[in-house]
């Protein structure tokens, strides 16, 4: 049993996709009741009747103390911790409509707020926690990041993640709330918030590259090289944006990159596999219920790297394949034909050569 964990009466989760549902299952072990906001009232009723999120996480029975609701205010009322797991590109719209609810029921009671969404907003090039900060200025916001496939989390399989906040005491507070007493979901605290957000976004783009390698017929050696060089790209952007780098070689960076780049449970990896086999992005979108996060992230990541003059060669080639009529085979040939260089682990970001 893990000592020092915190129990609450009520938790709230905004966002009912696979990961949001999985985190709600974790909270259900720590709270007397958990409410999950789902945008469709009819679907919320179906989930409550079946005790299973048949829309986004089938096969994982939901705890009896977990309920879905389409009423954002009902979800927030009385919550002692609030998690956000709304897709990044829809987060601002939700906050524009419902930020008053957060101010009335969350901020006024000094409730911990934790961002669990991953990606980069196209219009602003902001990360999810930065978007939330615009609506809750000067309010402490935490982040959860790390290797965590939703189905495994929901089923209580062993998972380790990081809780991050600018104030280490806040990160540790969230850590105590989210860590389960049986240790099946364990959190490690850090202050490298921007590092966690960058790693969470970039690993999805790099997973597309890894899947494309698989689709092209390569095996383990090539994937190991891609993960290693991809990790340096995460590090370079993290340092350029003011991160400490602590998260890069821990669970949010190396841990999540290893997981997402190596398993067909990752939607990003499977999208990459299809691209590597020559299937177009349009066809992938047409035949998929949910598009992988890395597809939406690759374009704003390309612009963010240029803005900060950081060279991200692998992520750049993913962008080319997705949005510039590129070809996976040509992109990897280009990457493997680059000028010979030292391995090196420079302390400062490499300057852009794009």
Swiss-Prot record:
GO terms for biological process: carbohydrate metabolic process; glycerol-3-phosphate catabolic process. Pfam families: NAD_Gly3P_dh_C, NAD_Gly3P_dh_N. It is found in: Glycosome. One of its GO terms (molecular function) is NAD binding. Its main location: other. The active site is at 203 (proton acceptor). InterPro entries: 6-PGluconate_DH-like_C_sf, 6PGD_dom2, G3P_DH_NAD-dep, G3P_DH_NAD-dep_C, G3P_DH_NAD-dep_euk, G3P_DH_NAD-dep_N, NAD(P)-bd_dom_sf. It is an enzyme of class 1 (oxidoreductase). A motif (Microbody targeting signal) lies at residues 352-354. Substrate binds at residues 118, 267-268. GO terms for cellular component: cytosol; glycosome. It catalyses: sn-glycerol 3-phosphate + NAD(+) = dihydroxyacetone phosphate + NADH + H(+). Its EC number is 1.1.1.8. NAD(+) binds at residues 15-20, 90, 118, 150, 267, 293. The keyword Nucleotide-binding does not apply. Keywords: Glycosome, NAD, Oxidoreductase, Peroxisome. Signal peptide: none annotated. HAMAP family: NAD_Glyc3P_dehydrog (MF_00394). Belongs to the NAD-dependent glycerol-3-phosphate dehydrogenase family. PANTHER family: GLYCEROL-3-PHOSPHATE DEHYDROGENASE, GLYCEROL-3-PHOSPHATE DEHYDROGENASE [NAD(+)] 2, CHLOROPLASTIC. This is Glycerol-3-phosphate dehydrogenase [NAD(+)], glycosomal.
């Amino acid at each position: 049993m893990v000592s020092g964990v915190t129990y609450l009466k009520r938790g709230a989760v905004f966002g009912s996709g696979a990961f949001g549902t999985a985190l709600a299952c974790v909270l259900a072990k720590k709270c007397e009741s958990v409410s999950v906001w789902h945008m469709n009232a009819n679907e919320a009723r179906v989930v409550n009747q079946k005790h299973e999120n048949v829309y986004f996480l089938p096969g994982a029975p939901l705890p009896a103390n977990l309920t879905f609701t389409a009423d954002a205010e009902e979800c927030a009322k009385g919550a002692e911790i609030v998690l956000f797991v709304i897709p990044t590109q829809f987060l601002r719209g939700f906050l524009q409509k419902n930020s008053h609810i957060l101010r009335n029921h969350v901020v006024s009671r000094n409730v911990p707020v934790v961002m669990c969404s991953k990606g980069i907003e196209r219009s602003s090039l902001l990360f999810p926690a930065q978007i939330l900060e615009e609506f809750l200025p000067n309010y402490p916001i935490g982040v959860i990041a790390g290797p965590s496939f939703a189905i495994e989390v929901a089923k209580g399989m062993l998972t380790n993640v990081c809780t991050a906040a600018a104030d280490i005491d806040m990160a540790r507070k969230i850590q105590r709330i989210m860590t389960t007493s049986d240790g099946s979901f364990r959190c490690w605290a850090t202050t490298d918030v921007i590092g966690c957000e960058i790693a969470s976004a970039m690993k999805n783009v790099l997973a597309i590259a890894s899947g494309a390698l698989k689709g092209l017929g390569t095996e383990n050696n090539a994937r190991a090289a891609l993960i290693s060089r991809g990790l340096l790209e995460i590090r370079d952007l993290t340092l350029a944006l003011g991160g400490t780098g602590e998260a890069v070689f821990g669970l949010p960076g190396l841990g999540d990159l290893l997981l997402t780049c190596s398993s067909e449970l990752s939607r990003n990896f499977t999208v990459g596999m299809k691209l590597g086999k020559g299937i177009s992005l349009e066809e992938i979108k047409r035949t998929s219920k949910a598009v992988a996060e890395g597809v939406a992230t690759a374009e704003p990541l390309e612009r963010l790297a240029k803005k900060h003059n950081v060279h991200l060669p692998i992520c750049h080639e993913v962008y080319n394949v997705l949005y510039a009529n590129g070809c996976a085979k040509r992109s990897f040939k280009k990457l493997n034909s680059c000028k010979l260089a030292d391995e090196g682990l420079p302390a400062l970001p490499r300057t852009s050569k794009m």
